[in-house]
Regions:
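Short amphipathic alpha-helix used as the core "switch/output" element in two-component signaling
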Residues: 39, 61-73
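Active-site residues of response regulator receiver
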Residues: 52
Length: 120
């Protein structure tokens, strides 16, 4: 079982993703914006940050950059409808994070999470 921090501003999607990831056997802490994720990241208690890119207050790319400093061993995965932004923006996110474009099937999400965690 891995500990996953989910940052997603869409309430319905966040609840849906949390349930699916928990059913796959992982522990999930979810927040609705990047700024709320920072204290959890600083705790160092998470294996994976699963974050949307477009969120209020702090986008997922900035959140991943801060995560690289606060918890360098934590893996990062983006879920977004704006994959081109993640792939083209020059940034210093940890270890070339995986980008999963919305819409996606839950089995694809869980499969990608398992790949990332097993490679860590």
């Amino acid at each position: 079982m891995a500990r996953i921090l989910l940052a997603e501003d869409d309430d319905t999607l966040r609840v849906f993703l949390t349930r699916a990831i928990e059913r796959a056997g992982h522990e999930v802490t979810d927040v609705d914006r990047g700024t709320k994720a920072l204290p959890f990241i600083a705790s160092g208690d998470f294996d994976l940050l699963l974050t949307d890119i477009v969120m209020p207050e702090m986008d997922g790319i900035e959140l991943a950059q801060r995560a690289a400093t606060l918890a360098p061993k934590m893996q990062v995965m983006f879920i977004t409808g704006f994959a081109a932004v993640a792939l083209n923006r020059k940034n210093e996110t940890p270890q070339q994070p995986k980008v999963l474009s919305k819409p996606f099937h839950l089995r694809d999400l869980v499969g990608e999470i398992e790949k990332i965690l097993s490679a860590a």
